[in-house]
């Protein structure tokens, strides 16, 4: 809870020891009497979307194919970052914000999986789906409209689960993992032929310089090697990026050597 201070006239003011707590014209009353059906309710915040109404197969996919891969990959990356941050104040300062941002959704995924398990959400969803199926079966028109809903949902989620897991591993390891990939994608986005020298200078100033301000190449080299390794272990061979063929052939599958060579030539 934050207390907002204002000037003597109850208007915004610079700091002064004479400032007083702001007095609003209206306040939202808080009742301790509980609530009744049809009482007014509101959500504080701005949720852009919700997964509250996911079916049981959707919840299962979120747990197994989204959260678990994210927890694993970010855990590996953050452990590498943390070791370097503990060993160097310079690295700690550079990576403090990055670490906090990465661990935020990492903790979210861990907490979500624990909560879904503790509350037996999948079992509850299945009970709701069974009740829905029973309701549909009681009426011919309902069967005509909704008869295939659950089958289609099950088929849609189960048939896409493997690809969702692959997508999560690749995205977490490369788009959100090794920072050098982000740098490469940033540079690729520049339309060199269609840009003036001044526009390129502005791009370099606004993006590239700020990137290197809080970047440690030797640390990112370790992350790249670790990300390459975990993807190779978790993603089926037929779904691996083509670069893995080069690494296997030229570097004998040694991702640390590959990463060292990449950074040596970058």
Task: Describe the residue ranges of each PLM region.
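Terminal presequence/propeptide segments associated with secretion/organelle targeting
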Residues: 1-266
């Amino acid at each position: 809870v934050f207390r907002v201070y204002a000037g003597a006239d109850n208007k915004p003011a610079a700091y002064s020891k004479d400032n007083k707590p702001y007095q609003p014209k209206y306040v939202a009353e808080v009742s301790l009497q509980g609530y009744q059906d049809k009482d007014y309710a509101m959500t504080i915040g701005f949720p852009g979307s919700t997964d509250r109404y996911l079916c049981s197969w959707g919840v299962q996919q979120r747990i197994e194919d989204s959260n678990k891969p994210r927890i694993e990959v970010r855990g590996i990356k953050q452990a590498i970052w943390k070791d370097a941050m503990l060993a160097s104040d310079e690295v700690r300062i550079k990576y403090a914000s990055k670490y906090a941002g990465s661990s935020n959704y990492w903790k979210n995924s861990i907490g979500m999986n624990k909560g879904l398990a503790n509350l037996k959400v999948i079992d509850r969803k299945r009970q709701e789906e069974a009740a829905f199926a029973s309701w549909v079966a009681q009426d011919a028109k309902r069967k005509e409209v909704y008869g295939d809903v659950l089958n289609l949902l099950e088929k849609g989620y189960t048939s896409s689960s493997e690809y969702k897991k692959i997508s999560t591993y690749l995205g977490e390891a490369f788009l959100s993992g090794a920072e050098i990939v982000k740098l490469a994608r940033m540079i690729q986005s520049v339309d060199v032929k269609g840009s003036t020298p001044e526009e390129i200078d502005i791009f370099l100033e606004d993006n590239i310089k700020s990137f290197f301000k809080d970047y440690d190449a030797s640390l990112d080299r370790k992350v790249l090697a670790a990300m390459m390794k975990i993807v190779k272990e978790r993603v089926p061979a037929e779904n691996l990026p083509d670069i893995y063929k080069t690494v296997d052939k030229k570097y004998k599958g040694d991702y640390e050597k590959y990463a060292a060579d990449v950074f040596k030539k970058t």
